[in-house]
């Protein structure tokens, strides 16, 4: 949902092809979907948010000479050299930062048991990779737009909605359907 929010804030007319493989290990189906997204809908970048299955989407990008966005960690650093070469950036789930935050809070005598805590961009809970391929291949205009988008979230101009409630999930489905090719 954050991806759609960010992309449509930068380009209100953008089209986003969203597909679900239904699990985290089906690389074959993810590759099939990736190839279809590129060949049928002219997707020029794919974010494979599906655990190991996303690697199939990366393989589709490699075969079609398109960019891939990694997920959870810096996949450019963990992929084989051929897949790393087409990984433009990665959406980061900074689990290490959340663990440090939790133990710092615990050491300070704060107890959050039973409380929902959201560690977003401002707290370092999530982020994106802006060095390596991104730094090398992104235009200055793209880098500026990415920084503007980050700043808009940090200063509250853009609120990243959640899908963790029924209302939020319904909003995600509606928004996803609005931007389909």
Predicted regions and their residues:
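A residue-level marker of the well-folded mature domains of exported/periplasmic proteins
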Residues: 1-181
């Amino acid at each position: 949902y954050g991806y759609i929010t960010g992309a449509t804030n930068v380009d209100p007319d953008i089209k986003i092809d969203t597909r679900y493989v239904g699990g985290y290990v089906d690389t074959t189906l993810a590759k099939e979907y990736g190839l279809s997204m590129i060949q049928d809908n002219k997707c020029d970048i794919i974010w494979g948010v599906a655990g190991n299955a996303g690697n199939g989407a990366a393989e589709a990008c490699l075969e079609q000479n398109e960019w891939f966005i990694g997920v959870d960690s810096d996949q450019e650093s963990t992929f084989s050299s051929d897949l790393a070469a087409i990984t433009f950036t990665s959406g980061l789930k900074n689990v290490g930062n959340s663990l440090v935050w939790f133990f710092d809070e615990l050491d300070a005598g704060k107890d959050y048991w039973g409380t929902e805590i959201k560690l977003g961009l401002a707290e370092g809970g999530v982020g994106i990779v802006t060095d390596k391929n991104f730094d090398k291949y992104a235009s200055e205009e793209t880098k500026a737009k990415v920084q503007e988008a980050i700043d808009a979230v940090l200063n509250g101009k853009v609120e990243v909605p959640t899908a963790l409630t029924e209302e939020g999930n319904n909003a995600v489905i509606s928004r996803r359907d609005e931007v389909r090719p």
